[in-house]
């Protein structure tokens, strides 16, 4: 009986690693950048009731494929009407096969369903990691539109072992991340 291997993980081992080794001239396998983890995060309205919190957590569990952790405020901030210990969001860290399956669903299914999608920004954080904001969680196939009471946004962080942005960008590009071409960069609005 053979062990199941996610298709994107197989693609990484069979296509991406040899391509990176050839293009970058890595001599050691440990030099080749890899995806370490994927972190999903969302905020919850501080005045949300328990049912709304449960709905957000249910949707995040479905998207991630594993249980999320509720984030609580560490201190009270009167201007934001925030009490210490109040639930302010939830997050989940994906590693291993869950991470590879999620990335495959993100790249192949979720991102292409965005209306007028022209690719995602190519900017990384300076250390080879990629951050992506998703405005509406209903782009994921695990979420049925009938059960959604409120649309939520997600923050997505892909942490890589790449030492530079160029290495991280090349790794993600070879994995199939649909980056925007440099000629399609949106122009800043000008004052009229």
Residue ranges and their predicted role:
Residues 1-192:
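Ribosome-associated RNA-binding proteins
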């Amino acid at each position: 009986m053979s062990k199941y291997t996610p298709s994107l993980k197989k693609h990484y081992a069979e296509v991406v690693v040899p391509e990176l080794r050839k293009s970058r001239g890595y001599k050691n396998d440990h030099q080749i950048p890899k995806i370490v983890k994927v972190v999903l995060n969302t905020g919850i309205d501080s005045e949300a009731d328990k049912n709304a919190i449960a709905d957000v957590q249910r949707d995040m569990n479905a998207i991630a494929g594993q249980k999320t952790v509720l984030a609580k405020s560490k201190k009270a901030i009167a201007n934001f009407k925030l009490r210490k210990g109040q639930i302010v969001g939830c997050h989940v860290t994906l590693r291993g096969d869950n991470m590879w399956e999620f990335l495959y669903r993100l790249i192949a299914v979720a991102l292409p369903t965005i209306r007028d999608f022209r690719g995602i920004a190519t900017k990384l954080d300076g250390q080879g990691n990629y951050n992506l904001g998703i405005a509406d969680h209903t782009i994921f196939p695990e979420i049925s539109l009938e059960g959604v009471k409120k649309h939520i946004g997600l923050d997505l962080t892909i942490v890589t072992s790449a030492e530079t942005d160029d290495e991280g960008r090349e790794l993600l590009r070879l994995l199939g991340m649909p980056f925007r071409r440099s000629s399609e960069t949106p122009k800043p609005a000008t004052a009229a």
